[in-house]
Amino acid sequence: MAMQKLFTYIYEFIEYRKMVLLEEKVPYDKFVQMVLNTGFFRINAETLNHGIVSVFIFGANGKYVHHGGDMRTLLTNTLNEKKHYEELILIVDKPVLSKKNILDIIVEQRAANPTIVINIYPYHLFCINIPKVSAIPKHKLITQEEAQEFLGREYLQPQDLMQISASDPPVVWLGGRPGDFVQIERPSETAMHAVVIRFITKSKI
C-alpha cells in the first residue's frame, strides 16, 4: 500500500514543486519491479533554475538502506555524473532514519558536496498530498525581500520569529530550506485569515 501511494504522490510532489520530469513516467508495475530488483527507483527532474533534482525511493529491505558502503557508492557515483545537481531527495522506510551507518553517509556526502542539498525523508511524507490536506493551513514561501520588509515593519530580527523545521511536511513539499521564510495562513475568529511568518531552521537529520 505504501508503494502505491508513493508512486502516486511523488509525481504530484514533483508537479507541485514546479519541476519538469526528465524521463517519461513509468507504469506502476515497472516502478515496483525496479524497487524490488535494484533496491531503489530514481526520478530525475529539472527545476525552474535548470538545476537537477534526483529523487530516490528505496525499498525497505534493499541493500542500500542496510549497508553504508552501498549507499556511499550510489551517492558518490550519482554526484560524479557531472550534472548540475541542485538536490538529492532520498525517501526511505522510517526505521532507516535511526540507522547511524546510513545517516553518517548522508552527513559525509553533505560535507563533500556543500553546494548540493541532500535530504532524507520517511515514506509517509509522500504518501499523501500535503498541500491538499484541509487540516493543514496554507503555507507559502516568501522572498527574502518580502521577509525583510515584514521584519522592518515589525522591528524584528529573524531570530525573533517563531521557527519551523526544514523537515516539516509543508516545508518539504514547498522545497523550503534553512534561512528561508514561510508565510502561513491560519483561520481567525476576527478575520478570514491570520497571516504569520516563520523562519525555517535546519532539521535534525
From Swiss-Prot:
Disulfide bonds: none annotated. GO terms for cellular component: DNA-directed RNA polymerase complex; host cell cytoplasm; virion component. GO terms for molecular function: DNA binding; DNA-directed RNA polymerase activity. InterPro entries: Arch_Rpo5/euc_Rpb5 (IPR014381), RNA_pol_subH/Rpb5_C (IPR000783), RPB5-like_sf (IPR035913). GO terms for biological process: transcription by RNA polymerase II; transcription elongation by RNA polymerase I; tRNA transcription by RNA polymerase III; viral transcription. The keyword Transmembrane does not apply. The keyword Transcription applies. Pfam families: RNA_pol_Rpb5_C. It is found in: Host cytoplasm; Virion. Keywords: DNA-directed RNA polymerase, Host cytoplasm, Transcription, Viral transcription, Virion. Belongs to the archaeal RpoH/eukaryotic RPB5 RNA polymerase subunit family. Component of the DNA-directed RNA polymerase (RNAP) that catalyzes the transcription in the cytoplasm of viral DNA into RNA using the four ribonucleoside triphosphates as substrates. Part of the viral DNA-directed RNA polymerase that consists of 8 polII-like subunits (RPB1, RPB2, RPB3, RPB5, RPB6, RPB7, RPB9, RPB10), a capping enzyme and a termination factor. This is DNA-directed RNA polymerase RPB5 homolog. It comes from African swine fever virus (strain Badajoz 1971 Vero-adapted). The lineage of its organism: Viruses, Varidnaviria, Bamfordvirae, Nucleocytoviricota, Pokkesviricetes.
